[in-house]
Regions:
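Pre-Walker A (pre-P-loop) alpha-helix and adjacent loop at the N terminus of AAA/AAA+ ATPase modules
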Residues: 2-39, 85-92
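Walker A/P-loop
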Residues: 33-68
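Short, well-ordered alpha-helices that flank and scaffold nucleotide-derived cofactor binding pockets
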Residues: 27, 55-59, 121
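Residue-level signature of catalytic and energy-coupling elements of molecular machines
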Residues: 15, 58, 162
């Protein structure tokens, strides 16, 4: 088992730090239909709990997570294919879904022709919460996504918070 997977929190109560951002994330998912923005961008350094928070929420609340790593699907066609499939398919076990797009800052390379714009257009139509993670939102190619999303900041964990998690 990979070390990071072994020590990854499985429940929200196991996540250290970033309590306010996690609380706002939970509110967004639970009240998705009432939010004016249909997506959230979780911004913070690697290891701050962005992706773990989504999976812990899903585990506790019986949601299915459909994950796309943006660095693997960079162009318009591949993003449209994933999003259309995710938005239109029913869960095998009739669970509610979360669409997680990890590392959207990976969309800023030369091969990413139209990827961010396609994603921005599709996420407005989603019947499911779209959650994106990023280390940096200052990239100009992501401005359309950032404007259409609620942004929640995650701070780096302190050494004592990391110690609590490992202890």
């Amino acid at each position: 088992m990979i070390w990071a997977d072994k020590h990854s929190p499985k429940l929200l109560k196991d996540i250290k730090g970033n309590f306010m951002s996690i609380e706002l994330l939970v509110d967004f998912i639970k009240n998705f239909e009432r939010h004016p923005k249909k997506s959230v961008v979780l911004v913070g350094p690697t290891g701050s709990g962005k992706t773990s928070s989504v999976y812990a929420f899903a585990e506790e609340n019986n949601y299915e997570v459909l994950e796309l790593n943006a660095s693997d699907f960079r162009n318009k066609a591949s993003i449209e294919g994933f999003m259309n499939s995710a938005m239109n398919q029913m869960s095998l076990f009739m669970k509610p879904k979360i669409i997680l797009i990890d590392e959207i800052d990976g969309l800023s390379g030369m091969k990413d022709r139209g990827g961010a714009q396609a994603l921005a257009k599709l996420m407005e139509k989603s019947s499911f919460p779209v959650i994106m993670t990023a280390n940096d939102t200052e990239l100009s190619k992501l401005s359309t996504l950032i404007k259409k999303s609620k942004v929640l900041e995650f701070d780096a964990l302190t050494s004592s918070e990391v110690g609590e998690r490992l202890g």
